[in-house]
Amino acid sequence: MLALAVTVLAVSANAASFKWIASNIYGADGNKYAGEVTLMAYAVGDTAADAFVAATATSSDAGAVSYTFSNDSLVGGTSYNFFFTATQTIDGKDYVFTSAEKQNIAAQATQTPNVSFGNMATATQAAGAWTTAAVPEPTSGLLLLLGVAGLALRRKQK
């Protein structure tokens, strides 16, 4: 029983040690991930938005809406902003963004473009919530086991 208590103590002491290291992040193709492009999409007629310029009209009639942007070179680690503005309700699942340079704004630039803004809601309709759940600390179970082992040893000695 004493050997078990010593083993539990050694395991719990080892479980408390950890090592922080920094390493490269690799993409699905095995190349190092150099940077991330964050794009917030806003469409404004013939207006420059960061490095992107709307080259066509941005009317949103009853049909499909399409925008063409020029000067759209994406740089890793950079944020770009677009503004989608409209006076009527727009169904977000109808919007798709692809770059003429075949860059996927949601992944690495080497991947095929397949970006869509699906099931979007306006700020007045969307609500965020932060929920947490109680999770016991990993060593608390081991400490409980060590305490029960100590009580068992004490009871055995009496």
Annotate each predicted stretch with a short phrase.
Residues M1-A16, A127-L146:
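Short, threonine-centered small-residue motifs that mark membrane-proximal processing/anchoring sites
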Residues A16-A134:
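Mature extracellular "passenger" or substrate-interacting domains of secreted, surface-exposed proteins
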Residues A149:
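Conserved Rossmann-like nucleotide-cofactor binding loop
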Residues A152-K158:
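C-terminal membrane-anchoring or membrane-association module
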